[in-house]
Amino acid sequence: MGLSRTMTAIQLNSSIPLGLPVPPHTPHAISVSLPTWSETVAYKEGIKHINDALLNGYPRMFIQLNVRKLSSLLEQKFGINGERCMLFPTYKVAEQCQLFMQARSVGARIVGLLICPEGKQNNRVIECKEPANLSESTSSASTNLYVVLFPPDMFSIANQFWQHSGQGISSRLTDHCLSILTENAAHANGSSLSPLTFPGNSHVAPEQLEVGHDVDLEGRCGGPLLADAAIAKQVLRQRIAGLLIRYGSCDYRAELCVGKKNLEGNQNSRDFADVTENDVYLFPTGMTAIWNAHQLALAVRPTAKSVCFGFPYSDTLKVLQKWGPGCHFFAGGTDSEIDELEIILEQEFARDSTKPPVLALFTEFPSNPLLCSPNLLRLRALADKYDFLLAIDETIGNFVNVEVLPYADILLTSLSKIFSGNANVMGGSLVLNPNGRHYTALKAHIAAHYQDIYYPEDAIHMEWNSRDFEQRIKIIDDNAEAICDFLRPHSVAAGATNAVIKEVFYPKYITPENYERCLTKGTNHDLSSSPSNGGGGYGGLFSLTFTSGAASAAFYDALSCFKGPSLGTNFTLACTYTLLAHFKELEWAAQYGVEAGLVRISVGTENTEALLRTIEAALGAAKEAKGL
């Protein structure tokens, strides 16, 4: 398949020019170089020459150039009065986008296309409803594509669905579609697009598309690829389930039952079921997994507000706010806020004891970017007492370092991050806890309604990338701990005088008791959970706040590593997190400790000493900027 294996030990990279893909020279890279503080600000301010320089971006935040190309072609063909469009892999997802827009009083229509290679199905117009199932629709080189068209001034509304739900067309699927159109355009006869019609959509006659796009495909959607993808997806599900079992503790599982017994632990561990591959569901992005978890809760449980506990990645909160009846937001994720939550639960239950006071509680372990770990023991107790779902996003902690499934009804992970590591493919997973009291209902619904929209070629790359996941975690854990142990004594929080660093946000220092309670015991189930005893580590992510904006900018600019959005890469990647995620709400974020000057660093597998040297140099630049 033309894939190359990534080394677990890599060289520390210098920053690369603005707008180039990160990692460079990588098809379907999912980050972009933002090498300086000022260029990042200019990008967020919409300065034209800066935005024009961007050749890439994080796929949910930045519509990739090949996706823009295909969208433009389809807008020219099917758009009326300058309509814009969004592209989706299935009718079901397109309809969800349409409903999201209609709920905001925006009209949207769907055109379905069957894109066929020359000579397939004679390129005739095919009028039909959604295929019976996705496997039938992708059983050949032909590709179904669903186009949501809407008024041009409503693009920002459609883009919210694209960003929050993460269900837009994959860049690899886009390349496949463009390659078919390119090949077909070279032939004198035949149409490369066949519209499918749906209720409420007018028929659109096919026209020849002229396409001048030269695509270098990594693979083709066809027989062998689909067979490989089916195997890859099965291996991914088995790998995730296997990691949860491998790094789980039999003794530990006996202490929790997710609603089947009390927390004192009086039930034998043999009454507990291990998670299997059939409890693991794959999605095209981590946010798609989160979005679907929320939709699953809305479908299975009585309607109520959700709870967002702890300051989360920005789109998680948006999903809980924009779908369903809204959410209660507890940004600190502290024990005192659990007390506040309990008061709300008591009040709501007193008001109506016939249904749970909340739908579900979503939390990250630990949180991004403040690395705060909530007290899962208390949250699980409340979930049992008041009968609501507990969904835990363990992306930052990861399968190797923390064991949080025993507390969760639903476990969520962005596989795009450290599970992949190569930053060249997106993916997400949702795992149902087989020991949960609501497992049967959740399982029945997802089994009936789950649609596999994970593009085959993406699954193949994800499987390949994740083969050395465990080995990479150990290297990254050690590197990050060495860096944070170096930086912490230079912080105000640690009592340093004339410091430029205010705080080092890292699980070892932020709510360590909650994090360490969930450390994996290691594969030998050593009862002492600590990195030194072969157990889980503190992960590869940390954030820094500074005593001045000038110090923040100087530190960031001086870092000799890749700089741009995303995390969990095999290489060290820094970003101005708050500017990227909350630029239009800086004051709002600051009140919860997410300061505008925060720098987030995802540590890679480079040489430890080389990493320490660049961190020390950046610290020196920050001190100089403050006149120290």
From Swiss-Prot:
> A GO biological process this protein is involved in?
transsulfuration
Pathway annotation from the record = Secondary metabolite biosynthesis
* Entry cofactors: pyridoxal 5'-phosphate
Q: Name one GO molecular function term.
A: pyridoxal phosphate binding
Q: Which InterPro entries match?
A: Cys/Met-Metab_PyrdxlP-dep_enz (IPR000277), PyrdxlP-dep_Trfase (IPR015424), PyrdxlP-dep_Trfase_major (IPR015421), PyrdxlP-dep_Trfase_small (IPR015422), Trans-sulfuration_enzymes (IPR051750)
Residues bearing the modification N6-(pyridoxal phosphate)lysine: K417
Q: Does the record bear Lyase in its keywords?
A: yes
Q: Which residues bind substrate?
A: Y313
Q: Which domain of life is it from?
A: Eukaryota
Query: Any idea what job this protein has?
Result: Cystathionine gamma-synthase-like enzyme; part of the gene cluster that mediates the biosynthesis of the psychoactive metabolites ibotenic acid and muscimol. The first committed step is glutamate hydroxylation by the 2-oxoglutarate-dependent dioxygenase iboH, and the last step is decarboxylation of ibotenic acid to muscimol by the decarboxylase iboD. The order of the intermediate reactions is somewhat ambiguous. IboA likely activates the carboxylic acid at position 5 to introduce an amide bond, and the flavin monooxygenase iboF generates the N-O bond.
What protein is this chain from? Answer: Cystathionine gamma-synthase-like enzyme iboG2
